[in-house]
């Protein structure tokens, strides 16, 4: 076999492969055996029909076609191995010559991972925010905890912000009650802005038994129109928050004193922020590398992924009785802008994958069994399924190699992060140990092939 590689672009090559007919003989012989298993000829057992009989009965051309279908993947794979390129898509094959006795010539165009010259990670400095926990941070957490233990006490006074009221409400448009426009006996926090615009202002100052009408600007399919709403207050209750003392600490936690509870909250906030700092370091390292490297992406893969995501959006909108443009309009985004954002996201995801795949290849990183197990557990947890179910899903969908590649990229990012210099905004060195994040969190994956 002879093969040549022509570089069409930094992300696409063209193979020209020539295979002599002598080299095809094993493939032709195997094709005869396959065909013999499929034909039934009186006097011969299945699989035992001689080639001359097959030629006379169904024609040698059928056998040669089978041999061609088997030979192309085999010799294409050999050509890829010899060229030592990382293919990332299915090849576009064109047979330029194949005749009985003359051998085979074909071309294959395919997308490849671009060559990336990585900088020495030890020359890179990543700056992150420092981890600090103030008394105000602890106070805010304590206040939120106390709020969860608050009780509601009926009061005989006008409603004000922070009160909980029991209400009946009807919303009409052009005199007709809207679908889902009736609320009966609902508990509502005044000032929470959770139902319709204008409700909070209408409720303030009302006592139990009083009603009010107000204009309610609508959203969704009625965006731009204004309904008329009527609300009646049936009861007003005041939220009573427990005092922050040792008794509260014993009620709300396993600690005996408020100071012990405060110390625990401070430590928990610090732990969370160290994880956030680690995530920030990963993101800023990736962005630093992307900014310093020119990493091309194959347009065919980008276009295919953009189309796939557009179809997902279309189905999502359709399931809600809308089209994609209408759904995006509710979110304040045009279809054109959305497509531009999706394309930019896909291109960035591909660049990150190429970057990390290059690290994997250069450093010959491999996954240990425990690392793969951790990755599967983390991914399963994020998806809300058991690790066994997630692993079985990967097997059923033939996506185990994609999961392994994704886990390796996470390991590559960790490898880089361990070798760069990390400082906070004051210039102090940062030790990221203890703030590690799962490999599954690294970057969303784009299916390449």
Curated annotation (Swiss-Prot):
GO cellular component: cytoplasm
Cell division found in the keyword field: yes
Source taxon at top rank: Bacteria
EC number: 5.2.1.8
Feature: compositional bias, Low complexity: 438-449
GO MF assignments: peptidyl-prolyl cis-trans isomerase activity; protein folding chaperone; ribosome binding
Catalytic activity annotation: [protein]-peptidylproline (omega=180) = [protein]-peptidylproline (omega=0)
Localization per Swiss-Prot or TrEMBL: Cytoplasm
Primary location recorded for the protein, binned into one broad class: cytoplasm
Keywords for this protein: Cell cycle, Cell division, Chaperone, Cytoplasm, Isomerase, Rotamase
One Pfam family this sequence matches: Trigger_N
PPIase FKBP-type domain mapped to chain residues: 162-242
Renumbered residue ranges of the record's region Disordered: 428-449
Signal peptide: none
InterPro entries: PPIase_dom_sf, PPIase_FKBP_dom, Trig_fac, Trigger_fac_C, Trigger_fac_C_sf, Trigger_fac_ribosome-bd_bac, Trigger_fac_ribosome-bd_sf, Trigger_fact/SurA_dom_sf
Disulfide cysteine pairs (residue numbers): none
One GO term of the biological process aspect: cell division
Family statement: Belongs to the FKBP-type PPIase family. Tig subfamily.
Protein task: Involved in protein export. Acts as a chaperone by maintaining the newly synthesized protein in an open conformation. Functions as a peptidyl-prolyl cis-trans isomerase.
Domain remarks in the Swiss-Prot or TrEMBL record: Consists of 3 domains; the N-terminus binds the ribosome, the middle domain has PPIase activity, while the C-terminus has intrinsic chaperone activity on its own.
PANTHER family: TRIGGER FACTOR CHAPERONE AND PEPTIDYL-PROLYL CIS/TRANS ISOMERASE, TRIGGER FACTOR-LIKE PROTEIN TIG, CHLOROPLASTIC
The protein's name in its UniProt record: Trigger factor
